[in-house]
A protein has these predicted regions:
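Basic, flexible Lys/Arg- and Gly-enriched helix-loop patches that mediate nucleic-acid binding at interfaces
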Residues: 1-231
Length: 231
């Protein structure tokens, strides 16, 4: 197995990030520093990162979390805020979030130790759909505003791609995007005159929040993980 893939399977980082870790000289194999991500290794190769020996690939798992507002979607936080890792009991597995969800947003977030899958779900080329429900200000949402969201709107970092948009109530919309820019849904809604008051992610690819209570988590079934891999 290639060294970068081995690190990803061991839960160190996504495969792309693992390649950077290797090239930075932070990885040793049998006590020798290795900077080639393509180096072949196996469970007997005595791989270490920053001097810490790896036990070998962990069983690959994916958890769904219903993140509350105020919880940050990072593995650790320098300001001492609670993180999504505190919502999951995973028997010591090294999990990390698949993408981000703003601290002031809530809803569905995935955690995994499968670096290859995480990369597939977040890389722009795969256009994985993510669905949100937004409560907005600015009065009743017009069909004109919805049409603009469906076409794509101009943002400060370039136009957004066409999105799925439908009105659920006068001030609530469901929005499905296939991009993952910073605070994108909030910026799109503001661009059509409807600043977001409350935002919840309810869908990620084929997965839905579906009754998972706020602050709770569950491990995805094999079938659910395979559906994610098929995206």
């Amino acid at each position: 197995m290639r060294l970068a893939r081995y690190l990803a399977h061991a839960g160190v980082a996504s495969r792309r990030s693992a390649e950077a870790v290797i090239r930075a000289g932070r990885v040793t194999v049998a006590g020798e520093t290795v900077t080639d991500p393509a180096r072949d290794v196996d469970e007997q190769s005595a791989v270490a990162v920053d001097g810490r020996a790896l036990d070998g690939p962990e069983p690959r798992v994916v958890y769904a979390v219903n993140k509350p507002v105020g919880v940050v979607s990072t593995a650790r936080d320098t300001h001492g805020r609670p993180t999504v890792l505190g919502l999951v009991s995973a028997a010591g597995l090294r999990l990390y979030p698949v993408g981000r969800l703003d601290a002031d947003s809530s809803g569905l977030l995935l955690l995994t130790n499968d670096g290859e899958l995480a990369n597939r779900l977040t890389h722009p080329s795969f256009e994985v759909p993510k669905t949100y429900i937004a409560t907005v200000g600015g009065g009743s949402v017009s069909e004109r505003a919805l049409a603009a969201l469906r076409r794509g709107v101009q943002l400060d970092d370039g136009p957004s791609a066409p999105a799925g948009a439908r009105r659920l109530a006068q001030n609530r919309i469901e929005l499905t995007i296939r991009e993952g820019r910073n605070r994108q849904v909030r910026r799109m809604c503001a661009a059509v005159g409807h600043p977001v008051i409350e935002l919840t992610r309810v869908g990620f690819g084929p997965l839905r929040l579906d009754g998972l209570r706020e602050g709770a988590s569950r491990r995805l079934s094999v079938a659910e993980v395979e559906r994610l891999r098929a995206l």
